Amino acid sequence: YMNEYMKETNEALLHTYNQFPVVLDHGEGAYLYDTEGKKYLDFAAGYAVSSLGYGNQELNEALKAQIDKLFHTSNLYYNTVCGKAAEDLKRITGMDRIFFTNSGGEAVEGTLKAARKYAYKKGTGRYEFIAMKESFHGRSFGALSVTGHDPYRAPFEPLVPGVSFAEYNDLDSVKALVTDKTCAIILEPLQGEGGINLATEEFMKGIRKLCDEEGILMICDEVQCGMGRTGSMFTWQSYGIRPDIMSMAKAIGNGIPVGAFAMTEEIAKYSLEPGDHGTTYGGNP
């Protein structure tokens, strides 16, 4: 089966997805409708993105109003909405400083740079990362370098050096990889692509304690498991700990390309400064 839309897409786009033979036309709530009028209950939610459903009128009206007013200026200028959005994220994360991005992968890249800059400014000489086996953090070069899934990594190696991989939920495995060059430990509190693996309380608290004792930063990637998907706003909040840096995206925007990374004030004091990092579209109104 091949209609004009599929044919046009297949002839023009790079083939990086094996797409279902369905051409979607519109959505309403939790349902999607194709060009032939068939109705589908959507369990995928756009890869954990469509948190408010399809055709959400309140969201649509807000978007229309802002587009008519102003939708991009760059981060060289203040605008009327970015600060409020950042304050909202501070409130729900308990973090102190926010940086807006265009995607989850970009947010993860920011967390890695923030950790490296912190170590650089502190003069520790640390640069290595410990990540988890079967993790997924994104497809850009830095994010892929801390992704512990060989089929995704193999075609692009060598990747960023200085990354080692521990067994998930195995604190001894993590401890065995710590050196005086370890800059940060990055993990998903709930692994998605790795098989819906939930971190144990012992593991999360153990990582936090290890980081505190060894002068290592703890990074939690909440791009997929965050925004209320596990009973708390962010999964790490269920463990009674707080990471130093975190990433988020997907369900924040309900399909609008927005993500963010956040950090504590202590990290921000010694981390990214003007000239260290940027984004062309991130944080636009």
Where would I find each of the regions flagged by the language model?
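Conserved N-terminal phosphate-binding loop of PLP-dependent enzymes in the Aspartate aminotransferase
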Residues: 1-285
